A protein has these predicted regions:
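Proline-aspartate-enriched helix->loop->beta-strand connector
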Residues: 95, 99-109
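Short, hydrophobic/glycine-enriched beta-strand segments
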Residues: 14-20
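Short, well-ordered beta-to-alpha junction loops that form the rim of enzyme active sites
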Residues: 20, 109-113
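C-terminal capping/extension of enzyme domains
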Residues: 3-14, 35-36, 81-96, 116-157
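Short loop/turn segments at strand-loop or loop-helix junctions that form parts
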Residues: 20, 73-75, 130-131
């Protein structure tokens, strides 16, 4: 069974971005979006107006400084490889419990599997975003960034 990471969260977060489940590369590195081909970190650095860094503590610190939390919809599952289509035996994370007493106003779902697993259980706006995964190669970076920027800007600034 694959176990998700602990959330990156504090009570000042206004946006919670939910993925599905860590990839093989992410699990090996012990980091969210650890596959260098995944565009999540490039999107977030640009969206938040910060200079890109490969340092994971810089990445997570940037999110929290800007009121962005990060977690997965799936708490544990079985999966061969990294593709979301191979996920089975899902136990969802309790998103409502995480943000019950915080200031999250928007839950953003990164990709189709996150959307499929998530159950509207929170008092917040919910937005569906195209996946930053390399499996979503049909969407170029500029288009992907534009969609994310349009959806999240009202909650970040």
């Amino acid at each position: 069974m694959i176990e998700s990471f602990a959330p990156i969260y504090d009570k000042n977060c206004r946006v919670l971005i939910l993925g599905s489940c860590p990839s093989v590369q992410s699990l090996a590195k012990g980091e969210y979006y650890g596959n260098r081909q995944n565009r999540f970190w490039r999107v977030m650095f640009r969206l938040l107006g910060e200079e890109y860094s490969d340092d994971y503590s810089v990445k997570t610190g940037m999110l929290l400084r800007h009121g962005v939390a990060l977690w997965d919809t799936i708490g544990s599952c079985a999966r061969q490889g990294s593709l979301d289509s191979a996920i089975k035996d899902v136990r969802p994370n309790d998103v409502a419990a995480l943000i019950r007493d915080g200031g999250v106003r928007c839950v953003a779902l990164n990709g189709g599997k996150a959307k499929a697993v998530f159950r509207q259980q929170v008092d917040a706006d919910v937005v569906f975003l195209p996946s930053t995964s390399p499996a979503n190669a049909r969407m170029d970076f500029e288009t992907l960034f534009s969609v994310w920027q349009k959806a999240l800007s009202p909650y970040l600034y």
